[in-house]
């Protein structure tokens, strides 16, 4: 289960990253607020 709001998170978002709001393809650091 990926954290974040995107439904098309790339696999690396499942490894401590989250998907950026408005751009589910873009990973951002888990410390950033989405």
Curated annotation (Swiss-Prot):
GO cellular component: extracellular region
Protein name: Mu-conotoxin GS
Covalent S-S links between cysteines: 2-14, 9-19, 13-27
Modified residues (4-hydroxyproline): 10-11
PTM annotation (4-carboxyglutamate): residues: 32
Main location: secreted
Tissue specificity: Expressed by the venom duct.
Pfam families: Toxin_24 (PF08094)
Keywords on record: Disulfide bond, Gamma-carboxyglutamic acid, Hydroxylation, Ion channel impairing toxin, Knottin, Neurotoxin, Secreted, Toxin, Voltage-gated sodium channel impairing toxin
Role of this protein: Mu-conotoxins block voltage-gated sodium channels (Nav). No effect was observed upon injections into mice and goldfish (25 ug).
